[in-house]
Amino acid sequence: MASVSSIFGCGVSMAPNSSLRNKAIRTERRSACGGLLIECSSRPQKKSTAHHMKTRPRKSRLSDRNRKPTVYAPLPPLPPDFTIVIPADASTVDFTPPPPTPSD
C-alpha cells in the first residue's frame, strides 16, 4: 500500500515530542499540498453486512428462544420434464424429411 506522502507528493513530518506537536500541526496545515488536509474519520461507518448484523432483531423472549423451525408438508413429486411419444406401430410409419428450401 502506498504512503500518504507518495500519493499526494508532499512530505509528512512528525513532531519529536508533545510540546511541539501543536506547532508542527499548525505549520503542516499551512504547507499542505494545494490546501488539502488529510484527516481520518473519528467515527467510520460500518459496511452494510456488519451494520445489519449489529442492528438485527434479537430473540429476547423465552418463547422466541425456544421456537423450533416451521415444519412444512412434503411437496408432491414433480411431473417429468420430457415425455417421449412413440407411435403405436413405429415400423409402418413412413418418415420423409421435408424438402430442402432453396437459398437465395
Swiss-Prot record:
Transit peptide, residue positions per record: 1-39
UniProt KW Ribonucleoprotein keyword: yes
Gene Ontology process terms (BP): translation
GO cellular component entries: chloroplast; ribonucleoprotein complex; ribosome
PANTHER family in the record: 50S RIBOSOMAL PROTEIN 6, CHLOROPLASTIC, LARGE RIBOSOMAL SUBUNIT PROTEIN CL38
Stated family: Belongs to the chloroplast-specific ribosomal protein cL38 family.
Name of the protein described by the UniProt record: Large ribosomal subunit protein cL38
Organism from which the protein derives: Pisum sativum
Lineage, broadest ranks: Eukaryota, Viridiplantae, Streptophyta, Embryophyta, Tracheophyta
